[in-house]
Amino acid sequence: LSTPSRACLMTGLYSHQNGQRMLAEGVDSTKTFFSELLQKAGYETAVVGKWHMSCSPKGFDFFHILNDQGQYYNPTFSTTGHYGDYKQEMGYVTDLITDHAIEYLDRRDKNKPFCLMVHHKAPHRIWMPSTKYVSKYANVNFPLPATFWDDYESRGSAAHTQKMSIDKYMEMVRDL
C-alpha cells in the first residue's frame, strides 16, 4: 500500500514504529520526516501529488497535494499555507501533478540544493486514462496470452500456493 510505504520513506521507520500500518491509521506526526532533516541541511523541499498521510506535509517548503486518494478527473488540491483547504482544478490528474512539479522546478531557488517528491495517482486503482487516450486502441484486438487462464496446477509449490490470484485479489472481472 502506498500510504504505509510513504510513511516508511518519510520517517525511515518500519510501519509498526511509525504508526501507519494500514490506510485507516495515521502516521505518528511526532516522528521526524526526512524532509525536515533536508531543510535543516539547507535544502529546499517540495512534494506534489498524492500525500494521503493524515497530517500536514511537514518539512516541505512547497506542497501541492491531492485530497485523500484523489480523483483522476478534475481533482482537488491543497497547497502550501492552506493545508486542508482543497480547491478543484480542471484536467487529468497526471497532467496536473506533472505541471505543478515542473512549475516548482522553474521557480525554485536555483542557488540551493533541492528535493522534489512527485507522487502520481496513476499507479492506484481504479485506473483511468486521460480522456485524450480513452479510444486510442478502440479498434485494436489484443489477444490474450496462452497463460492468461493458467491455474498454476503444474507449477512449483511457491507459484501453486500463491495467495495473490488475478481473479480474487486483483479484481480481474472489474478491470476487464
What are these regions (language model features)?
Residues 1-176:
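Formylglycine-dependent sulfatase
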